[in-house]
Amino acid sequence: VTHAIPGAAMSYTISTTVDLPYDRAVEATRAALADQGFGVLTEIDLAATLKAKVDADIAPHVILGACRPQLAEQAVAREASIGLLLPCNVVVRADGEQRTLVEAIDPEMLVSVTENAELSEIARDARTRLDAALAALPARLH
């Protein structure tokens, strides 16, 4: 059992930086997620949305809503309201011309808010798969 240090922020992300231009990193991220059984259910172009709604300019930035249906079904069977926390968001954002940051929400941290211990194993599985997807990104540089 781990305990948070008072005053310390709990990490809620899994992240990596890749030496790929943004568009190629988005493509590689989609493929890496698919290799781990995740489908992308939603896609929000945050840069375009902020430009259209509040005329703000930010670097290219997309939010992919990733879901592994088998895990979602197991989670819903154990916690009817879990849909409020689905899908797992994966963010791809430009960090210059040739570097891109890829971040995913940590499913284990996310389900901790439910205080439902039955979700821990499901969240751990999702975390392992997201870790593997992000770890595979450097291999997609070629």
Regions found by a protein language model. Name each.
Residues G39-L41, D45-V91:
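Compact, glycine-rich, soluble single-domain proteins
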Residues G7-Q36, A135, A139:
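Terminal, regulation- and interaction-focused segments at domain boundaries
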